[in-house]
Design a protein with these regions (language model features):
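Conserved pre-ATP/AMP-binding loop-to-beta segment of ANL
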Residues: 19-20, 142-160, 166-167, 190-196
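AMP-binding/adenylate-forming core of the ANL superfamily
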Residues: 331, 343-357, 376, 382-383
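AMP-binding/adenylate-forming catalytic core of the ANL superfamily
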Residues: 90, 107, 353, 358-359, ...
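Conserved structural elements of the adenylate-forming
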Residues: 37-46, 152, 171-192, 200-204, ...
Length: 506
């Protein structure tokens, strides 16, 4: 869907339509209206201009989640800046890398971290913003409502990828990317000003900011705005909300609560899950408990959202991420030749549409290598299209295990392991092997109170897997390493078990 108005201007149309409507509903009972938010945006815009921010300058943010942080995002767009949200967990060398690479004009950080960044040496203006709106950013009462006229091809934000395979890359998202993706999601999920979203996601990530917040701002909806996920708080809010956007760990935690029931979900119309795969068993258990089928979608930092299971007019299939959003094309190609593959065959997922980013910040060669000549972006995800046209993500291409010349897809083994009654979850990786190049290792978390033995699990999967796919080793752990969005960090596991077969007999 081609955009016709930017996120900033759409958001301020919402302000004009309903200035007194609550945009943020906070845990302490306070509300912040659209008018109040607009006033904060204009105060921050004046401060950014005073700090010397010109169109195209980067404004970095590493602050606790607050309504003022969303206002900072909008103020950056207002003055023509490029918004750079950074994970609040980053420290030391990580932050130095992002600041040196993006070279922001302004960094807004938590008050207690003001002196952490060698600001003078970098020519960096440092402002502070705390969780309660305190800090230097809002010291002045000056306001600016002047809006820089930007084009849809102009950069709006830079989001850094997780960098699990080397140097973290800054994905440049344009005003057109953000607006087009938001418009497609509003249509697909029928999100309107009547919705009340439970927002418990971080706002330095595409899901929490460019999906949840953008949709709410543009639709003129309201959100219960939480600093973090808390099972009891979420369940208390369900009768007063219509939509929850989350990650799989949200739903596994909700399922552990005896308080989760269909009665508490009577006002809800939509539960969305993404950023990591949702177990089919959790999908089914949630539907049985609440009467709601979770809607899974597929997106990534470079593209925003690409596909979605249907809101209506079709079934939501566990283990799939649905069909392309309006205006977006998806295809599956051979990982070696790049030739299109038939439905049902596993290959690389490629995407084309107005949602696809402009490129990687200051990495023209890397950008060129990630696009086909016809404009399709090579996602690096492995997937297949089923008989109904639904996309199923099999895993990351970098997670593919090649053992003795055979391609092994970890998800197939993980699904089998997860079906064992004593297993809570699993992650399958490839590690170096002297004879086969790589071999399969399974890392497994047992259900509470259960004891698991390696041989027990190896025997269990042997009934349904060819010998070359069977884990040569199983390691039982208390928990899998995850990032803040709940994705299992397989690179960390590969490092941890890299020497498992060093010196083994070939």
């Amino acid at each position: 869907m081609a955009p016709d108005i930017t996120i900033y201007r759409s958001s301020f149309e919402s302000v004009e339509r309903q200035p007194n409507k609550p945009l943020f509903e906070l845990p302490d009972g306070r509300t912040v209206s659209y008018r109040d938010t607009a006033d904060t945006v204009h105060r921050i815009a004046a401060r950014l201009l005073e700090d010397g921010v010109a169109p195209g300058d980067r404004v970095a943010m590493q602050v606790p989640k607050s309504p003022e942080a969303i206002a900072l995002y909008l103020a950056t767009l207002q003055v023509g800046g490029v918004f750079l949200p950074l994970n609040t967990a980053y420290t030391g060398a990580e932050m130095r890398y992002f600041l040196d690479d993006a070279q922001p004009r302004v960094l807004v950080c938590a008050p207690d971290r003001r002196d952490d960044y060698d600001a003078e040496q970098r020519g960096l203006v440092v402002e502070t913003l705390g969780e309660s709106g305190d800090g230097t950013l809002l010291h002045s009462q000056d306001r600016s409502d002047a809006v820089v006229d930007v084009g849809f091809d102009d950069p709006a934000a830079i989001l850094y990828t997780s960098g699990t395979t080397g140097r973290s890359k800054g994905a440049v998202l344009t005003h057109g990317n953000l607006a087009a993706n938001c418009a497609a999601l509003l249509q697909a999920w029928q999100y309107t000003s009547e919705d009340r979203l439970i927002h418990a996601l971080p706002i330095f990530h595409i899901h929490g900011l460019f999906v949840a917040a953008n949709m709410t701002l543009v639709a003129g909806a309201s959100m219960h705005y939480l600093s973090k996920f808390d099972t009891d708080v979420i369940i208390d809010l369900l009768p007063h909300a219509t939509v929850l956007m989350g990650v799989p760990t949200f739903y596994t935690r909700l399922l552990r609560s005896e308080r989760l029931a269909s009665d508490s979900c009577s006002a809800m119309r939509l539960f969305v899950s993404g950023s990591a795969p949702l177990l089919a068993s959790d999908h089914e258990a949630f539907a049985a408990r609440t009467g709601h089928a979770i809607l899974e979608r597929y997106g990534m930092t470079e593209t925003g959202m690409n596909t979605t299971n249907p809101y209506d007019g079709g079934i939501r299939k566990p283990g799939t991420v649905g069909k392309p959003l309006p205006g977006i094309e998806i295809r599956i190609v051979d990982r070696e030749t790049g030739e299109p593959m038939a439905d049902g065959e596993v290959g690389i997922v490629e995407v084309r549409g107005p949602n696809v980013f402009a490129g990687y910040w200051q990495m023209p060669e890397k950008t060129a290598s990630e696009f086909r000549s016809d404009g399709f972006f090579i996602t690096g995800d492995l997937g297949q299209i089923d008989d109904d046209g639904y996309l199923c993500i099999v895993g990351r291409d970098k997670d593919l295990v090649i053992s003795g010349g055979y391609n092994i897809y970890p998800k197939e083994i993980e699904e089998l392991l997860d079906s064992h009654p004593k297993v809570l979850e699993s992650a399958v990786i490839g590690v170096p092997h002297p004879e086969f190049g790589e071999t399969v290792v399974a890392v497994v978390v047992p259900n509470s109170g259960e004891q698991l033995r390696e041989r027990e699990l190896q025997d269990f999967v042997a009934r349904d897997l060819a010998r070359f796919k069977q884990p040569r080793a199983v390691r039982v752990v208390e928990a899998l390493p995850r990032n803040v969005m709940g994705k299992v960090q397989k690179a960390e596991l590969r490092t941890r078990y890299a020497d498992l077969f060093v010196g083994a007999d070939a």
